[in-house]
């Protein structure tokens, strides 16, 4: 019995070490040739220009994309907390990739596959920043590995506040709108500072972003 246990322990240890080796090998292989994440420091998005009449009505809007940049200090906590709750509950605890979130999503997706439900993602907000700014939307393991590597690097170089600012100004929220400031005008015809909890529930639900 003891001999069998020792043999099993050796197999498990060998498998664990092999897995660690493969992970480090993949990170080393995909680390070369990645986009320069440092350019995020000088991010200047193309924003919309709006023309209003004397009575305050919108006359015209000129833009390639519906987008209004707003500093993180001007985004109310109710908006920030709604996105954190919906997208990345462990944002302030993880280093770019959330191991607990990945494990939880894997278990949940096994249930979803059995029940024929929609699969859940496990990308952190930092990973989404890496994808939206530096990578493509290609669905592949290669892209996910690059996304994870960039997420680690972004977390080392930028504050959580800056990462949130980038995310909340870049996220696509449907109807051609990018960022929370532009979407608040599109959906509610009011400033992002005027949004309440019920507004944010619509903001963070999948439906406004179905057209991604």
Predicted regions and their residues:
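Single conserved hydrophobic/aromatic residue that forms the stacking wall/gate
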Residues: 203-212
């Amino acid at each position: 019995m003891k001999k069998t246990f020792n043999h099993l322990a050796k197999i498990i240890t060998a498998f664990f070490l092999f897995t660690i080796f493969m992970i480090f090998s993949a990170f080393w292989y995909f680390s070369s040739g990645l986009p320069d994440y440092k350019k995020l420091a000088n991010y200047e998005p193309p924003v919309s220009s709006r023309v209003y009449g004397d009575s305050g009505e919108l006359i015209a809007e000129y833009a390639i994309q519906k987008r209004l940049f707003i500093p993180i200090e001007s985004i109310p906590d109710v908006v920030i907390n709604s996105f954190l709750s919906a997208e990345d509950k462990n944002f302030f605890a993880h280093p770019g990739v959330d191991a607990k979130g990945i494990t939880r999503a894997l278990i949940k997706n096994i249930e979803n596959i059995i029940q024929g439900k929609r699969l859940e993602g496990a990308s952190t907000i930092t990973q989404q920043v890496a994808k939206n700014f530096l990578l493509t939307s290609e669905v592949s393991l290669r892209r996910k590995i690059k996304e994870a590597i960039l997420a680690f690097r972004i977390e080392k170089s930028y504050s959580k506040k800056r990462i949130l600012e980038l995310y909340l100004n870049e996220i696509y929220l449907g109807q051609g709108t990018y960022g929370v400031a532009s979407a608040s005008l599109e959906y509610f015809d009011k400033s992002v500072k005027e949004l309440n909890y019920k507004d944010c529930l619509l903001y963070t639900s999948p439906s406004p972003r179905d057209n991604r």
